[in-house]
Amino acid sequence: MQTIKCVVVGDGAVGKTCLLISYTTNKFPSEYVPTVFDNYAVTVMIGGEPYTLGLFDTAGQEDYDRLRPLSYPQTDVFLVCFSVVSPSSFENVKEKWVPEITHHCQKTPFLLVGTQIDLRDENSTLEKLAKNKQKPITLEQGEKLAKELKAVKYVECSALTQKGLKNVFDEAILAALEPPEPTKKRKCRFL
């Protein structure tokens, strides 16, 4: 059975673990526990063929900046996550996450993933953002940044409601199986 390795990166508390747990178990975790490193595997059928989708969760906190890249070798696709209600996590996509993955894995495709879309219209969230003269990140802003950073695509979801959740992983599988440059194998390799 062919394996697709998908590594999830992004700031702490943007919902990376919830995204993975909700997708693999159909349950939403009730409490926040920072991740050091975790992985999950699911079997998916693509064109009648079974594939193992290996999902690697990583810690977003700075304390793990030296440890995190150890999970990058042999990656087929990255999910670079930010919360649509955390403008700082959106900024860090450009400032930290894409530079980090492209430094280690220059040719590996990545998707830009906006998480927590269920909070985009929630009053208490909007009030908190407004106090700092901020607004949630829009679909258009996500698409614009994805294009600018040469992501395969921008997708967004809610791990809580599961809206858009399956699509995130369907698109990740497509990106891994049909990389934009068919002339080169695009797995991450450390030299």
Curated annotation (Swiss-Prot):
Disulfide bonds: none annotated. Signal peptide: none annotated. GO terms for biological process: actin filament organization; ameboidal-type cell migration; anatomical structure morphogenesis; cellular process involved in reproduction in multicellular organism; developmental process involved in reproduction; endocytosis; establishment of cell polarity; hemocyte migration. The modification Cysteine methyl ester is found at C188. This is Cdc42 homolog. Regulates mbt kinase activity and is also required to recruit mbt to adherens junctions. Together with mbt, regulates photoreceptor cell morphogenesis. One of its GO terms (cellular component) is plasma membrane. It is found in: Cell junction, Adherens junction; Cell membrane. The gene is Cdc42. Highly expressed in the adult unfed gut, expression drops after feeding. It comes from Anopheles gambiae. Residues 189-191 form a propeptide. Gene3D superfamilies: P-loop containing nucleotide triphosphate hydrolases (3.40.50.300). It is a lipid-anchor. A motif (Effector region) lies at residues 32-40. GTP binds at residues 10-17, 57-61, 115-118. Transmembrane segments: none annotated.
